[in-house]
Amino acid sequence: MSGRRFHLSTTDRVIKAVPFPPTQRLTFKEVFENGKPKVDVLKNHLVKEGRLEEEVALKIINDGAAILRQEKTMIEVDAPITVCGDIHGQFFDLMKLFEVGGSPSNTRYLFLGDYVDRGYFSIECVLYLWSLKINHPKTLFLLRGNHECRHLTDYFTFKQECRIKYSEQVYDACMETFDCLPLAALLNQQFLCVHGGMSPEITSLDDIRKLDRFTEPPAFGPVCDLLWSDPSEDYGNEKTLEHYTHNTVRGCSYFYSYPAVCEFLQNNNLLSIIRAHEAQDAGYRMYRKSQATGFPSLITIFSAPNYLDVYNNKAAVLKYENNVMNIRQFNCSPHPYWLPNFMDVFTWSLPFVGEKVTEMLVNVLNICSDDELISDDEAEGSTTVRKEIIRNKIRAIGKMARVFSILRQESESVLTLKGLTPTGTLPLGVLSGGKQTIETATVEAVEAREAIRGFSLQHKIRSFEEARGLDRINERMPPRKDSIHAGGPMKSVTSAHSHAAHRSDQGKKAHS
């Protein structure tokens, strides 16, 4: 060993190239000019992980809501335009999106929803997009996604993020503004743009125009379908004549078929449906062409690259101009690191420290025999009782060591799985569940446990399909605390299925 000494600073960062986030929150005077937020100032501050004074954040959210409230449930937008899919709190990739798609000051944009949850910079996405909406109300348009609701933001990450970075008041303001988001857009009188897709209860564009959107999306019905439905997994090659079948992946809404989409397009004189809602390896997908027009009947666009930091997918935006459609792809950008569920490093380290401390205690106690642990002056009759007490203490510490070991394994697994564990914990019993755990676990917990059981910390997720398979459980509508799926609403879902079957029968008769 040389006599060289190492000095470690407690104030400097280990990686000095990464600057500290700004400690000062931007004030009203710094952000607003002539009643509108200064977008460049806001962007430069948010990119550095800076925050705003709470009244400033609330002003942006509420002013954006006032504009959205005046828009129709189905807005009408013209080309040229850039259409964007899911963002999911990936703020630094959103900055890349605007580099690829063009500056919002001279480019018309349509976003298809899902701005929040899963990623760790959701509130930054909301504040920036809402600021753009305030500055460009006639050229930047925002639709609602299935994640813009109280139910999902409470289950996933957005509510927790708002509490940590701002307050629950900011979260509540976001929920109010989400209720104002339009549900669909008619692009150039040619394309229906929506987050999820079709509904058996929507046969015309007027059916969308008549919907009441100013509410929390229900667990069933046309609003739910616009936000949650998907094309059938064998879209364009269906083996059934049904137009709509139950969506087993989402646990709600429907799969819609190629014939259902073609019928809707023909009846409403449209070219195609443009939607988001599903991650795509290439960032987009063109589905089977309509026989009537020769144009893809359905297009999916997804704008969150390397989704959840594990999918390794490209993102894409769709540019439509002069009746020509171009897809522009882009890769992910580096972003600051957050521990799961916005945990601080001290809380995160407790299972690791606890495991070592209890392991040390067990080893110390195991060195000594029972006789050594009993004092010489103890009464002869109490020796047996005393030995049993000591054994019980050793067993208790051993159990505690096992608990900390499980917590440590869970922490490491969550760190490896990243966004695939959206609540920051593993499903109950993945590491230690026995018969009782299995008997009491919910269906969702059992499915999640089976999906990631046996996942090795040394294993690296290498493919898009593998990531999507592990994440499949998180694509479902989470269980509702008010048990809305039990009782009345389920009857409505059943009746909706009957309604869909009735429409399907009508469609078959019309085609025969």
UniProtKB/Swiss-Prot annotation:
Residues 386-400 are annotated as: Calmodulin-binding. Activated by Ca(2+)-bound calmodulin following an increase in intracellular Ca(2+). At low Ca(2+) concentrations, the catalytic subunit (also known as calcineurin A) is inactive and is bound to the regulatory subunit (also known as calcineurin B) in which only two high-affinity binding sites are occupied by Ca(2+). It comes from the Eukaryota. Its cofactor is Fe(3+); Zn(2+). It is an enzyme of class 3 (hydrolase). The modification Phosphoserine is found at S483. Gene3D superfamilies: 3.60.21.10. Testis. Residues 471-512 are annotated as: Disordered. It catalyses: O-phospho-L-seryl-[protein] + H2O = L-seryl-[protein] + phosphate; O-phospho-L-threonyl-[protein] + H2O = L-threonyl-[protein] + phosphate. It is found in: Mitochondrion. The active site is at H147. Its main location: mitochondrion. Residues 459-481 are annotated as: Autoinhibitory domain. Calcium-dependent, calmodulin-stimulated protein phosphatase which plays an essential role in the transduction of intracellular Ca(2+)-mediated signals. Dephosphorylates and activates transcription factor NFATC1. Dephosphorylates and inactivates transcription factor ELK1. Dephosphorylates DARPP32. This is Serine/threonine-protein phosphatase 2B catalytic subunit gamma isoform.
